[in-house]
Amino acid sequence: MPNYAVIDLGSNTIRLVVYEVKDDRRKTYSSKDFKSLINDKVMAGLSAFVADDGTFTDDGVRRAASVLKGHAKRARYFDCKRIDVFATAVLRNAANSAEAVAAIERESGLAINLLSAADEAHLGFVGATCDRTIERGTLVDIGGGSTELTRIEDGRDFDNVSLGQGSLSSYAAFVRAILPTPEEMDAVAGALFERLAALSDRDAYRTDVVVWQSGPQRP
């Protein structure tokens, strides 16, 4: 059975997962078709390498490339058929996005798939519905640098929106110590509510069914 490596290059962590796939010729899968052989993450904190002018710094490029090379080395022990790298908000929103991605690719030797906000939201929906059907509701994916909302109707994903506020960016903007104070938590919530209020189609995401996804929602 072939092995595939996936590397998620996020604002906070860079995660490697190597999957053993029962049959890679199929078009549809459930989680039973995959076996995780390794699940390893590095707290890279890439959002800290975004300068005041919005550019991703050279130090950030070196940090990202170093972690990617380490993950690729581990993946090759498993004789992976492919190694796919996906990047999200931290590089997507950088003022020098294309240049930063190209620099990381040169230094790491790996190609990077830079996901649009819409692609990120859709892939989150695909993962959430791999083993179950969600007929309606709003899928909420809180990452380090952004939050994606996806409207689900009749078991399909429709509208989606990316809010430029995630767990790590909220921490950097509002929290001074290790743990947030009640006032700081109110400030984080207030900033998020302002972003939601600015959405012209915010009513489309109102629902009594909320599906949470990704790390910050885990206990």
Give the label of every model feature segment:
Residues 1-11, 17-139, 150-219:
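Nucleotide/phosphate-binding catalytic cleft detector across ATP-hydrolyzing
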